[in-house]
């Protein structure tokens, strides 16, 4: 029983974000379709070879996606919304891009599909749309083509396929209501056809991802797995793959399925290895997800070895990453600015492949010398002064219940704020960022590289802030923002100014489509050495008589969008960040900033996957936000922003944040999200996003008015704000001006109605 290793997937974007650059060049008309396809082929070939050279035995194929792997699955099944279809019914790469972003170099623009978070990660997927009577057929052969590519290169491979039940679970019904699970029998023939094609190619194992099996599923969904896999058995060996949590709740269902192997996440799940072994069929292969695919820390391989060694020789065993390495940066070796000590604490995707090779060899040979040597820096980190700060720990221990309470209830605060700001009905604002032009990015890059001194850099940023204020006043917006020209990323910027964080040069991970982020890493206790946003906010406010919002990223979002420490709880990290940003709120207020926005778009995505664990998370998540905000006086208006959220099941917690104004993403869901606020009788003010900033399409005045009219049917108009869905950083100025002008006009029309 020789143990082999494998990965569940590998980052797609390329070490230098080659895929992003190729996509955006193609969308802009500066590259041909063939040039784009060539970049994809080159990246796939490189990544397979890199994994192989790092010691991976069985390479994943089908993990590459031009936009998103769930969207790829939709195309595989021929599931293309009518508004995105080619006139001749064919599917091509532009079909995919129209679904993802609303437009492509060919075809008519149409509203993009809804986008939401992939389980509890920072990756976004395009939500499949289902209509009653829908038909499916194998049309998009990307998976088969890539299998052919890999086989031609001589690789030993394992195709990756999103499973049918999880695919349906992730989607939404459009039009006439019906149970989307009823489509299972309609999509299974396509899966059977794909598996038959893979069998023809000599494929032995297929990784079929069913991460929905880690959830507390409704009975009907859980019962659907058996007939689904009865239909899929027999053509190839199936590795049923779960990740992001444990499977103990659903183990009885899983063990009855006609598959040949099971992958479990032994990093994020609490499953007992011995229990898994005892309860799974004896002839099943067990793939042990021992290396964390979602973080950047070097693994303690001696600990991983001890966790699994008792199964050696007792059943077929593979060792693997916990999940796809999509969520990890690619290669630590190119990080030349990290000092040796900190660098020794990390492992990126390629290094994690190396860890799998070391672990495989130790388990096969019984020789633990190499894994003991690899794990030595982890012991040193546990005692490093770079990790522990006694003052932070002391302040955290001194928190009282009063620290997270505003001085007065909302009704009292709202009256004080109305008197202070005297805003019109339907007040207009934006979420924070304005277009990050080539000039702005160049300015920041020159400063970072040392090609520009601090004085000239600040002069340049000040000019862009001034331009943003002028643009907003010209458009007639009521509450302004400074535009965030100085910020590359809403989390990275704060991490750069807080002690306890470090940054990489090339630690990019995909967020959605061509968007990549470079998350900071929390390496130690968090504190604020000095004010972060005050100077720029104060400068922007000096340029106008209208209120300018102070802009902060909230503690839970900074935590969720960073690579966290693994030696303390997430609650501890969030509260440390909250205390640091609490001081920032006090300083902004003292500088005359009367409206302060604390963005928490990640509050919901941080929810544990098992609902039984939600209450504990929401309790400390809400407390962290309130700890951050509660220092504000009554006439200081606290805003928060959230996106990609389903709110109905956490409305108690949303209300408990006690923000004076909440702005939310609603345009792609056609204001459906407001149903939750209406049913809950949410008492504070709401800004439902009236257009989708992820698409370059400009909404008409009539479109925005119609959305606001829908909103006013659910929420009293006197408590409604008018704003885009999200920040405008990724958009260009022409479409930004046009969209905001229409938004302001719609608000003015409603005031006069």
From Swiss-Prot:
It is an enzyme of class 2 (transferase). One of its GO terms (biological process) is methylation. Binds 1 zinc ion per subunit. L-homocysteine binds at residues 431-433, 484, 599. Its cofactor is Zn(2+). InterPro entries: Cbl-indep_Met_Synth_N, Cobalamin-indep_Met_synthase, Met_Synth_C/arc, UROD/MetE-like_sf. GO terms for molecular function: 5-methyltetrahydropteroyltriglutamate-homocysteine S-methyltransferase activity; zinc ion binding. CDD domains: CIMS_C_terminal_like (cd03311), CIMS_N_terminal_like (cd03312). Its EC number is 2.1.1.14. Coiled coil: none annotated. Disulfide bonds: none annotated. Belongs to the vitamin-B12 independent methionine synthase family. This is 5-methyltetrahydropteroyltriglutamate--homocysteine methyltransferase. The lineage of its organism: Bacteria, Pseudomonadati, Pseudomonadota, Gammaproteobacteria, Enterobacterales. The gene is metE.
């Amino acid at each position: 029983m020789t143990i082999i290793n494998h990965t569940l997937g590998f980052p797609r974007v390329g070490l230098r974000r080659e895929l992003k650059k190729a996509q955006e060049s193609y969308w802009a008309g500066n590259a041909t379709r063939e040039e784009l396809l060539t970049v994809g082929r080159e990246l796939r070939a490189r990544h397979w070879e890199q994994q192989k050279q790092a010691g991976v035995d069985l390479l994943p194929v089908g993990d590459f996606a031009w936009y998103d792997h769930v969207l790829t699955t939709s195309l595989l099944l021929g599931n293309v919304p009518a508004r995105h279809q080619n006139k001749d019914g064919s599917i091509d790469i532009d079909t995919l891009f129209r679904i993802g972003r609303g437009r492509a170099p060919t075809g008519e623009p149409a509203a993009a599909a809804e986008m939401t978070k992939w389980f509890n990660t920072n990756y976004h997927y395009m939500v499949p749309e289902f209509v009653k009577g829908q038909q499916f057929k194998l049309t998009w052969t990307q998976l088969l083509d890539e299998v052919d590519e890999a086989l031609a290169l001589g690789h030993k491979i394992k195709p990756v396929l999103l499973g049918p039940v999880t695919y349906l679970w992730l989607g939404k019904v459009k039009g006439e209501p019906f149970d989307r699970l009823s489509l299972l029998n309609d999509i299974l023939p396509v899966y059977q056809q794909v598996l038959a094609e893979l069998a023809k190619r000599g494929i032995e194992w297929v990784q079929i991802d069913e991460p929905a099996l880690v959830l507390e599923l409704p009975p009907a969904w859980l019962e659907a797995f058996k007939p689904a896999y009865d239909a899929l058995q027999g053509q190839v060996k199936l590795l049923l793959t779960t990740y992001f949590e444990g499977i103990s709740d659903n183990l009885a269902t899983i063990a009855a399925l006609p598959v040949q192997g099971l992958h479990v996440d032994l990093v994020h799940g609490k499953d007992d290895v011995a229990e898994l072994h005892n309860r799974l069929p004896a002839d099943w292969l067990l793939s042990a997800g021992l290396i964390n695919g979602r973080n950047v820390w070097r693994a303690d391989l001696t600990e991983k070895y001890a966790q699994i060694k008792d199964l050696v020789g007792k059943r077929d065993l593979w060792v693997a990453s916990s999940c796809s390495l999509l969520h990890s940066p690619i290669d630590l070796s190119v990080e030349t600015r990290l000092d040796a000590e900190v660098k020794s604490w990390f492992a990126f995707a390629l290094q994690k492949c190396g860890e799998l090779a070391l672990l495989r060899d130790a388990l096969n040979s019984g020789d633990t010398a190499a894994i003991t040597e690899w794990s030595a820096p982890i012991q040193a980190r546990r005692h490093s002064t770079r990790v522990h700060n006694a003052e932070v720990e002391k302040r955290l221990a001194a928190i009282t219940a009063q620290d997270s309470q505003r001085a007065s209830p909302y009704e009292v605060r709202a009256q004080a704020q109305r008197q202070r700001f005297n805003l019109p009905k339907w007040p207009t604002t934006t979420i924070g960022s304005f277009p990050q032009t080539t000039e702005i990015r160049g300015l920041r890059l020159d400063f970072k590289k040392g090609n520009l001194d601090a004085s000239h850099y600040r002069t340049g940023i000040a000019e862009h802030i001034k331009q943003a204020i002028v643009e907003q006043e010209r458009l007639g917006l009521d509450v302004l923002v400074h535009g965030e020209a100085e910020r590359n990323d809403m989390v990275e910027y704060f991490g750069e100014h807080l002690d306890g964080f470090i940054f990489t040069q090339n630690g990019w991970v995909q967020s959605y489509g061509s968007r990549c982020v470079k998350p900071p890493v929390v390496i130690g206790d968090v504190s604020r050495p000095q004010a972060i946003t005050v100077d720029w906010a104060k400068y922007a406010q000096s340029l106008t008589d209208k209120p300018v919002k102070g802009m902060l990223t909230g503690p839970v979002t900074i935590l969720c969008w960073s690579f966290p420490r693994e030696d303390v709880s997430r609650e501890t990290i969030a509260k440390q960040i909250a205390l640091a940003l609490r001081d920032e709120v006090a300083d902004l207020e003292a500088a005359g900033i009367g409206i302060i926005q604390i963005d928490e778009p990640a509050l919901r995505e941080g929810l544990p996957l098992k609902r039984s664990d939600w209450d504990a998370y929401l309790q400390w998540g809400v407390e962290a936000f309130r700890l951050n905000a509660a220092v504000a006086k009554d006439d200081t208006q606290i805003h928060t922003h959230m996106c990609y959220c389903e709110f109905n099941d956490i409305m108690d917690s949303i209300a408990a944040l006690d923000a004076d104004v909440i702005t939310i993403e609603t345009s792609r869901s056609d204001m459906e999200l407001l149903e939750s606020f209406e049913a809950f009788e949410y008492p504070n003010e709401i800004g439902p996003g009236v257009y989708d900033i992820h698409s370059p399409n400009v909404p008409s005045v009539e479109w925005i008015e119609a959305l606001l009219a829908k909103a006013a049917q659910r929420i009293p108009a006197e408590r409604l704000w008018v704003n885009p869905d999200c920040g405008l950083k990724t958009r260009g100025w022409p479409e930004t001006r046009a969209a905001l002008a229409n938004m302001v006009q719609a608000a003015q029309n409603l005031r006069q109605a």
